[in-house]
Amino acid sequence: ESLKAAGLPLRRFKTGTPPRVNARSVDFDEMELQPGDALPVPFSYGTQSPPENRAVCWLTWTTEETLRIVRENLDRAPMYSGVIEGVGPRYCPSFETKVVRFPDKLRHQLFVEPMGLNTEELYIQGFSSSMP
């Protein structure tokens, strides 16, 4: 509100950033564990010792209910209501774009990735959205 009061116009931008969720709110029993490489290869030839690969990810899928909710609320999505204009990324479309572009798919794959080794924050890869 203070930015508006200062005369700065506010709007949504297409950042393509998926939501973050708290790991304490996630049922990992419903997901498939995706461990890292047993012998991870470092990015640099200058790495003296192999990195410790302690972080794990999980694979999960959206449900038909998720797709229904998105379809029923597309008019609220700034990318589909005209609030945000422009073309989104080709290879990482928003979730609502996947729902529109692939109407025959009953589910979409998501990867749940830790944001770091010492945080409860998780990144939901494949779930970027402009939905409110």
Predicted regions mapped to residue ranges:
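An anion/pyrophosphate-binding glycine-rich loop and adjacent beta-alpha core
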Residues: 2-131
